[in-house]
Amino acid sequence: FGFHQQMLNYILSPFFYYQPDPWLTHKWKDEKRNMRKHSISFKGLIRAVLFSQTLIKSALAKRVRCTVLYATETGKSKTLAKKLNTMMNYAFSSKVVCMEDYNFSELEKESLLFVVTSTFGNGDCPGNGESFKKQLLSLNNLRNQVRYSVFGLGSRMYPHFCAF
């Protein structure tokens, strides 16, 4: 019975060889290539910070303005509108506003409009979107072509769901 049982009682245990940071231990062979320490003056640092701040301000000022409007009875549309606003803030200068708090005269100035609304009952408008609905229906035409998107929430159990 010549079974190879050398590994029968072999126990594996983890062991790591930690390498020291090479930038701390490296010795340059050529002294000309030896790294010299760069010192940054406080004045130079402030200039760099101010320059980057002006670049960021100009980039943020050029972003397209976006408004997310919501109307809700239960709060679900408000939650989704806030999530949408968070995502839109990565690319746009975005804000979220309830329909009843929205200044309707700003509609012509909007470049991008997202509407998140639910329907209540058989396709009826939520209470805080009623005034926006009336103003929108009384509007004859918009001089500025507003780009918009509507996300409607409702139940298919009603024959006129999302009719608002």
Curated annotation (Swiss-Prot):
GO terms for cellular component: cytosol. It holds the Pfam family Flavodoxin_1. (6R)-L-erythro-5,6,7,8-tetrahydrobiopterin binds at F3. SUPFAM superfamilies: Flavoproteins, Nitric oxide (NO) synthase oxygenase domain. Residues 42-62 are annotated as: Calmodulin-binding. Its main location: cytoplasm. The keyword Oxidoreductase applies. Binds 1 FAD. Heme b binds at Y18. Produces nitric oxide (NO) which is a messenger molecule with diverse functions throughout the body. In macrophages, NO mediates tumoricidal and bactericidal actions. Also has nitrosylase activity and mediates cysteine S-nitrosylation of cytoplasmic target proteins such COX2. This is Nitric oxide synthase, inducible. It comes from Carassius auratus (Goldfish). The lineage of its organism: Eukaryota, Metazoa, Chordata, Craniata, Vertebrata. The gene is nos2.
